[in-house]
Swiss-Prot record:
Keywords, in A-Z order: Cytoplasm, Ribosome biogenesis
Lineage: Bacteria, Pseudomonadati, Pseudomonadota, Gammaproteobacteria, Alteromonadales
Protein name: Ribosome-binding factor A
UniProt-annotated location(s): Cytoplasm
InterPro entries: KH_dom-like_a/b, RbfA, RbfA_dom_sf, Ribosome-bd_factorA_CS
Pfam families membership: RBFA
Gene name, Swiss-Prot/TrEMBL: rbfA
GO MF entries: ribosomal small subunit binding
Length: 133
């Protein structure tokens, strides 16, 4: 049996795909120099009037991330107009951009765990070599 998806899930998936494409192509050419931005998630309201777009901004400081979110908010009419041309909907959701730090935070935690494991192994190796002497 086919898996059922709600309309909001299908719209969110389509908005995700199209906004990612817009950011990669049209927005990038308008803004110029910008860090790598990926769309990590999209939540669409039940009435399809609003879409929360969570973006991950790589290789940027916290301040640069805030500037990029502000810049995305300034260009949301431009992004929404292109989105309206690509989607076959009566009305396109209003876009709200948020910075998603979960991926970067996960990478940071993973690095900390790896460093801790490496320190423990080197300490264990030192202890083993001292016991053998």
């Amino acid at each position: 049996m086919a898996r059922e998806f709600s309309r909001t899930d299908r719209v969110a998936q389509q908005v995700h795909k199209e906004v990612a494409s817009i950011l990669q192509n049209e927005y990038k050419h308008r803004v110029g120099d910008m860090p790598l931005i990926t769309v990590s998630d999209v939540d669409v309201s039940r009435d399809l009037a609003h879409a929360k777009i969570f973006v991950t901004i790589y290789n940027s400081t916290e301040e640069e991330g805030k500037v990029q979110i502000k810049q995305l908010a300034e260009y949301k009419k431009f992004i929404r107009s292109i989105l309206a041309k690509r989607l076959r909907m009566r009305s396109v959701p209003d876009l709200h951009f948020f910075e998603d730090k979960s991926i970067i935070e996960g990478m940071r935690i993973s690095n900390l765990v790896s460093q801790t494991i490496a320190k423990d192994e080197s300490k264990r190796d030192q202890d083993d070599s001292q016991e053998q002497e």
